[in-house]
Amino acid sequence: MNFPEIYSATGMMELIQKIGFLPLLDSGIEGFSAEDIVAEDCGYVRLPEGGWDWPLWKWKGEIVQEMPCMYGKFFNKKAGFISQEWWPDFCNYRRSKFPRPDEESIEGAILSTLQSTGSLITRELRTACGFTGKGMRSKFDGYLTRLEMATYIVTEDFIYPRDKHNREYGWGWSLLNTPEELYGRDACKCERTPEESYQRIFEHLKVILPDASDKQIIKLIG
């Protein structure tokens, strides 16, 4: 499938709705990422006066808030979008591979903390879970990535600090939540078996990515 060149967040939302799955950056499949299909002037650029501009990066919050859709590290530990239509099958398959963590485990404690407090930005959740010492940030991020890959945690929005002129700056922080809290338990329910969900996703990706090998698609599904 030849993807149209995208010039706006609205155009990106329409594409995600149409194809169901879209990694943000390099997916390992040539041409299959939001970064690959945006117009050249929507890509990352360093500004002469310092700083940077990257329209695609700024669209993420608008996309997850307005579609809505799921966003998180779903594709080989890399971030991307999944439409609500395809989320139940994806969730069904992934959770069959990664059952809900035991509450006594570190992942279970992180998930329980988020469920009890409601949405938190990453650093707030990290502090609430006691990952405050030296080297704890990278360890916490590893646990968080596993929970996102297993579809238990998603990004609700992106929060940016503001300068003295009340302008947003920086890369922003992910506001984390559970998909059930965001959209209700029915959003994750699927009537198919995990095997049926996997096959449905595989066949769909074969249609939209005709030049990708089976190995590449299998790796993408996880």
Regions inferred by a protein language model and the residue ranges of each:
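Long, low-complexity intrinsically disordered regions
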Residues: M1-G222
